[in-house]
């Protein structure tokens, strides 16, 4: 399967949003503010070199959004089109994002995965991401349009 990788630009937004909506797991992780065109534009402005898409025949088939605060990085979204999975695309995107983050001096990265997403949890374990059992993840929405989750 031939595909190319490039850095994400805001011009990719519509295709990325369509990709996210192609899977239930990605769709349920979206929120109307942070994942809006404006939210992603803001994110890319802060993280222009750590977000990548995989493109085949002019169509975006994979995306990873990673960013950092100067200390730690987080994978905010990783998605590969269902028809293009198990071909090494996700691993390739993760590897490129990790390399880009290392170039920016970041030494540690984490990601959030729904507990019931077995395939994703297995994937991240295979990528060397250990499950932290000694922490509780807590969040608070500062905008009534963003759900806090379960």
Describe the role of every protein-language-model region.
Residues 67-76, 85, 132-135:
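A conserved beta-turn-beta hairpin within the catalytic core of GNAT-like acetyltransferases
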Residues 1-11, 144-150:
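Conserved N-terminal entry element of GNAT/NAT acetyltransferase domains
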Residues 101-113:
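Conserved GNAT acetyl-CoA-binding A-motif
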Residues 41-53, 74:
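A short helix-loop-beta-strand connector motif used in the catalytic cores of GNAT acetyltransferases and
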Residues 10-42:
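Conserved GNAT-fold acetyl-CoA-binding loop/helix
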Residues 80, 86-99, 126:
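Conserved acetyl-CoA-binding loop-helix of GNAT-fold acetyltransferases
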Residues 53, 59-67, 74-79:
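Conserved beta-strand in the GNAT
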Residues 111-120, 139:
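Conserved beta-strand-loop-alpha-helix junction that forms the acyl-donor binding cleft
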